[in-house]
Amino acid sequence: MARITVEDCLKQIPNRFELALAATYRARQLVQGHTPKVDAKDKPTVTALREIAAGQVGIEMLKKVPS
């Protein structure tokens, strides 16, 4: 079972709302076939949170969202 906490991710992205948006956007990228930056045995949402907690993905995800 995946063990990732919001507190681990909040160290990288302190704003909870930006964290949720960044994780959502990254999870969508993973579903579309982008390569995971960490071990990807979990669902895309958990993998996205693991990437954020590891510092592999950050707030820059929000700058890539098309308007």
UniProtKB/Swiss-Prot annotation:
An example of a Gene Ontology BP annotation on this entry? DNA-templated transcription
Any one GO molecular function term: DNA-directed RNA polymerase activity
Reply yes or no: does the keyword Nucleotidyltransferase apply.
yes
- Write down the EC number: 2.7.7.6
Gene Ontology cellular component annotations, sorted alphabetically: DNA-directed RNA polymerase complex
Task: Give coiled-coil spans as residue ranges.
Answer: none
Catalysed reactions listed for this entry = RNA(n) + a ribonucleoside 5'-triphosphate = RNA(n+1) + diphosphate
Q: What class of enzyme is it?
A: transferase
Give the UniProt keywords, A-Z: DNA-directed RNA polymerase, Nucleotidyltransferase, Transcription, Transferase
**Keyword hit for Ribonucleoprotein:** no
Query: What InterPro entries does the entry give?
Result: DNA-dir_RNA_pol_omega (IPR003716), Pol_omega/Rpo6/RPB6 (IPR006110), RPB6/omega-like_sf (IPR036161)
Q: Which domain of life is it from?
A: Bacteria
**Subunit structure and binding partners:** The RNAP catalytic core consists of 2 alpha, 1 beta, 1 beta' and 1 omega subunit. When a sigma factor is associated with the core the holoenzyme is formed, which can initiate transcription.
The family annotation for this protein states:
Belongs to the RNA polymerase subunit omega family.
Matching entries from PANTHER family are given as:
DNA-DIRECTED RNA POLYMERASE SUBUNIT OMEGA
What does this protein's UniProt record list under function?
Answer: Promotes RNA polymerase assembly. Latches the N- and C-terminal regions of the beta' subunit thereby facilitating its interaction with the beta and alpha subunits.
User: Any idea what this protein is called?
Assistant: DNA-directed RNA polymerase subunit omega
